[in-house]
Amino acid sequence: MSGFRLEHADEYNHAAGTESNFNESVYVNGFELERRCGGWMRLGNRANEGHAETQVCMYLPDGRIACQFRRPEISNNEAFAAGGLSYEVIEPFRKVAMHYEGDIMVLDDPELLRDPVRLFKTAPTTPAKIDFELEAVSPMHGGEPLSPTQETMYGRDFSLGHFNQHMRSRAAVDIGGECWRFDAWGWRDHSWGPRYWTNIYFYRLLIANFGPDRAMMLLKITDRGGRTRRQGVLQYDGDYEEITDMDLYTDWTASKDPRHLRLGVRTARRAVLMEGEILRLAPLRNRRKVGDEMLQSRIAEGLTLWRWDDREGMGITEYIEILEDEEPVGYPL
């Protein structure tokens, strides 16, 4: 990927910038096609604000969602370890692991996630232990821009450096004594730089694996000026192909959540059509007060089943957008 620098040292923690909202975060996921299950974990250090963001979300084989969201105190950006969540680099550019041990909320009805106050007061909790080990099945993608004019994936007000990679994902999960394992496929990313979630006007991020040699990571992002960018990669026969065009059509629920996706993607080598069905959705949010105004984003995290030609795949669909007058600004696109 031209225009970016990426070194083994970037796998580890960077010196925190002077920005008050400097963030450095790591994320992993993995999903098993056969049982339609899996999950993701994220740890974001916001050392200049004195806390981390820890997020764990598992889509269980029986249809429930197990999750936890915290902001544990931290004093520096020297390690990825906070609130029972930890991350380690086993081999740069090849192998990483992420572990969680602590209480987790178990939800029969994910609609409770729409009301965080009620969620944290009433959701049943149980001890959990979750271990992810991930090994690369793709090249690395991304890095830190080499010039001040180089366009970054999400924009420089959401992260300066960013890289990602499709992975083989093995997990051992213990939720309240109910144990399961999977050996499947997933994805990881690592970002650093200034970040507020509400800096995103709206985007649609589509990540999925279709076996060890085929995958996608696609982003459609629109800024407050109405400018839209489409970027990302298809993995085909193990190689990444940068996309040149992308069309996305979303069918919605009555609650204005994404339900069914139709996708057309073109690279220099091929044009493909895909369809995706969101099997379960975690409806999350982020809020930030600026002066007298409360900014709020909806963050929809959907476990998604995809079809690409004769292959089925699994992954995560993430729709982020600002709410204006309680309405998502990107709807119905």
Model-based region annotation:
Residues 1-333:
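Structured soluble/peripheral alpha/beta segments that form catalytic or ligand/cofactor-binding pockets
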